Amino acid sequence: MMEPSFQVQGWCPGALRPMMSGDGLVVRVRPQAGRLTQTQAAGVAAAARTHGNGLIDLSARGNVQLRGVSTASHSALIADLRALGLIDAYATDEARRNVLVTPFADAATDALAARLGAALARMPQLPGKFGFVVDTGPAPVFAGIAGDIRFERAAGGGLLIRCEGATLAAPVAEDETSDAAVELAQWFVAAGGVTEGRGRMAALIGRGVAPEGRLAGSVAPASAAPAAVPGLVAEGALVGFAFGQMTADTMAALAALGPLRITPWRMVLIEGMRALPDLPGLILTADDPIRRVEACSGAPACLQALAPVRALTARLARDVPAGKLLHVSACAKGCAHPGPADLTLVATATGFDLIRGGSAQDTPDQRALSPETIDLKGLF
């Protein structure tokens, strides 16, 4: 079996444990419940200008990442973020706080997320990418986003806890959510879900192992809501960003409009907005062609990248039909879109490989394509 041409880290960067990339340190800030107050958002923008290169990424886990931070400025950045209430006491605490919360949260959802956050210290030692999903808004919106332990609602509104990969969930009372999450995490470890520090709930469930007793699944979650798109919603204005990246100036402008809910869809919800903001660089409509493509940072921003990809992806976006997806990856790791796409282009040492209906790690249909001459016409 061939060795992969990329390195799998097995952990996610944080603020206290940043990751070195091609443009400096990547410092990931994990807002509580995915929400930034206006003061916090303005502070993050200022910190990105002062300590980084002024670019801010939205991660697939609803976090914000400051790019281009130097090792010399990291300590000062942490001090600024700590003053904003965005930093945990220790890196181990930060690593545990892998909690994705629906941006359409009500008071009950925010309270559940707070209880879960307080319970993380009672969790067993879990793999670095083990995550919790709080999807208890008016309707589930994270059906296509992986987690490990999920809080959802039944069709009648009752609260549920579900293992990723399981069809049915267990009913749980509001005041028992944190205890149930701890118990389910303990069961995951005891049932053999962790091997050499790694493991995911879906893999364990896929082996036919399932919890028993009060955590046994017996109720189906409510049907998922339609996919979120840019535009006005009941809670405010959803705005998107090409490749999930904005400038510090854009973040500062958004902060002036209202509190921000960071989503895993490369979008931000501006709470309470009743009109779409008139700011440069925002995606405001569902039919924008840039929403039909996914691309990672590419070279030179990523150390593992074999080529620049974003300019190429932006050029090709106009040729992607509505309802189709093009994924352009700078290596076979496929960070921007781990799953299959209608077309995937993967950078190699000799050009780009093309994969139809697969992921970046699948066998190519065409190899060594020149980025200057790639033409998507007739391929979809």
Residue ranges and their predicted role:
Residues M1-P18, A224-P230:
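Intrinsically disordered, low-complexity polar/charged tails and linkers
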Residues E152-P226, R261, D362-Q366, F380:
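An acidic, glycine-/histidine-flanked metal-binding catalytic module
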Residues M2-S5, S21-R162, T167, P171-D175, ...:
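Small-residue-enriched alpha-helical segments and adjacent helix-cap loops
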Residues V233:
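Cofactor-/ligand-binding subdomain signature composed of acidic, glycine-rich
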Residues H327-P340, L354-F380:
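Short Fe-S-cluster ligation motifs
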Residues A89-Y90, G217-A224, G272, E372-T373:
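Intrinsic-disorder/low-complexity linker and hinge segments
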Residues A119-L126, A190-M201, V320-A322, D353-D365:
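Short flexible/disordered coil segments
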